[in-house]
């Protein structure tokens, strides 16, 4: 059985989207107050259950863990889908990146979304939505990803 999202639950798609809204002084799904800047740190593969299981090794992070601070990764829980959700503010069915390996029908091959990029692939044809960074820049706000 596939996992079902919680009704009105928060997901990775809400994180940067809420940061941008807070910087613009707008309401947002995370309930962030108006801010001037935001820094988001994502530790790939570090879900709430893994953090609970290793709480003794990550006391600062695990100490901040509450039921309200846990958000859904989305589905599927691959890095490609999750990072695209984080950076576009959209769920995988909307942004189009749903797994690691996908068919590149234009070149009749299977490519890896994380490491298989070459000159024959155009990112704009795979990621169907603009990123939060692109929208921030279009609004005249500085934005960067490291």
Task: Identify the residue ranges that each predicted region occupies.
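Active-site nucleophile/metal-coordination loop of metallo-enzymes that catalyze phosphate/sulfate
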Residues: 1-38, 45-133
């Amino acid at each position: 059985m596939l996992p079902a999202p919680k009704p009105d639950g928060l997901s990775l798609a809400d994180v940067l989207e809420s940061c941008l809204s807070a910087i613009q002084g707008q309401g947002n799904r995370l309930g962030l107050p108006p801010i001037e800047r935001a820094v988001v740190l994502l530790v790939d593969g570090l879900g709430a259950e893994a953090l609970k299981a290793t709480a003794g090794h990550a006391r600062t992070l695990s100490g901040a863990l509450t039921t309200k601070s846990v958000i859904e990764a989305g589905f599927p829980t691959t890095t490609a889908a999750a990072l695209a959700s984080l950076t576009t503010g959209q769920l995988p069915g909307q942004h189009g990146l749903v797994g690691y390996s996908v068919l590149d029908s234009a070149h009749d091959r299977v490519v890896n979304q994380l490491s298989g990029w070459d000159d024959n692939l155009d990112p704009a044809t795979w990621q169907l939505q603009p990123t939060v960074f692109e929208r921030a820049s279009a609004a005249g706000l500085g934005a960067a990803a490291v």
